Amino acid sequence: MFNQTQFFVLLAVFTTSSVLGNNNDVKDGAASGAHSDRLGLWFGPRLGKRSLRISTEDNRQAFFKLLEAADALKYYYDQLPYEMQADEPETRVTKKVIFTPKLGRSLAYDDKSFENVEFTPRLGRRLSDDMPATPADQEMYRQDPEQIDSRTKYFSPRLGRTMNFSPRLGRELSYDMMPNKIRVVRSANKTRST
């Protein structure tokens, strides 16, 4: 595995240097100003500097060289023994999830019958049977007559506003006069309402 990675790194460095090496030719051995002591290094283009010549032919040649290098990499990778090649990621699910219930809980929870247990609110005192410990549900959850009204209140009573909402000022609608069922009729001549 280590030899394989060394091979690919060496091949990638060789192809990159051969592609980029063609663009950094120093002509006639002349130094280029401030970069005269850095002949062998290339630091990339300066930001904001635009090239005077637009050469699509050079870019096309560089692209073809990169494609050729990638093709060579694939060829030599296919020549490697099968054990040294990378395995494809598995697409199948091989791990099964096994459900384990929590301790103390059985799957047949509904089949259990619970016994009535007497509740003593304080130690040493028991309530008599004729006096319930808590108020009945009807007493506890009985709604006020104001809440039974089917229409919702538009103002919160805690703000001190208890007036009924009317759609227009000075006009009270009587909802008793409105029909329970509304008849919807379609036009016979296929006109559309806007």
From Swiss-Prot:
Protein's organism: Helicoverpa assulta
This protein's UniProt keywords: Amidation, Cleavage on pair of basic residues, Hormone, Neuropeptide, Pheromone response, Secreted, Signal
Molecular function, one GO term: neuropeptide hormone activity
Protein's recorded name: PBAN-type neuropeptides
Residue numbers carrying Leucine amide: 47, 103, 123, 159, 169
Propeptide: 51-94, 172-194
Cellular localization per UniProt: Secreted
Function according to Swiss-Prot or TrEMBL: A hormone that controls sex pheromone production in females and pheromone responsiveness in male. Also mediates visceral muscle contractile activity (myotropic activity).
PROSITE patterns from the UniProt entry: PYROKININ
BP-aspect Gene Ontology terms: neuropeptide signaling pathway; pheromone biosynthetic process; response to pheromone
Other known facts: Juvenile hormone seems to allow PBAN release, which then induces pheromone biosynthesis. PBAN is produced independent of the photoperiod. The circadian rhythm in pheromone production is due to the circadian rhythm of PBAN release.
Homology family: Belongs to the pyrokinin family.
Transmembrane residue ranges: none
Signal peptide: 1-23
Domain of life: Eukaryota
Distribution of this protein across tissues and organs: Synthesized in the subesophageal ganglion and released in the hemolymph.
Gene Ontology terms: cellular component: extracellular region
Keyword Nucleotidyltransferase: no
